[in-house]
Every structure is written in C-alpha cells, then in structure tokens.
C-alpha cells in the first residue's frame, strides 16, 4: 500500500482524520501482534503507518 498524498489528506475533515488515525493505530497494533507471534510481516509497513499517522495528526493540529 502506497503512502497517501498530502493533497488528498488535506481534504479530510477532523472527524475523518480521527477515524483514519484510529484505523491506522489498529493496523499498527495488528502488525506488532503478528511480529510477536512470528507470523510473516512486511517490516516497511511499520514505518509507513507511523509516517501516515504523523501526517494526519499534523493536519489535524493545523486545522484546529
């Protein structure tokens, strides 16, 4: 999954940003769980998810 473009994210409302952050945090939790149980994972997803969460939280702060 490719990273979202900032131009696409800027069109989101605060509620949509909150929902997307929650979704990404759940995905990050699931990845950590898979790693702990020795399942096959894609290590680069950790960085991508954290990066996208940071982008969303930055946009939320700017909109407030």
From Swiss-Prot:
Keywords carried by this UniProt record: Ribonucleoprotein, Ribosomal protein
Zinc keyword on record: no
Keyword Zinc: no
Bilayer-crossing regions: none
GO MF term set: structural constituent of ribosome
Pfam families named in the record: Ribosomal_L29
Gene3D superfamilies in the record: 1.10.287.310
GO cellular component: cytosolic large ribosomal subunit
Example of a GO biological process term: translation
PROSITE patterns: RIBOSOMAL_L29
Family, as annotated: Belongs to the universal ribosomal protein uL29 family.
HAMAP family according to UniProt: Ribosomal_uL29
Protein's recorded name: Large ribosomal subunit protein uL29
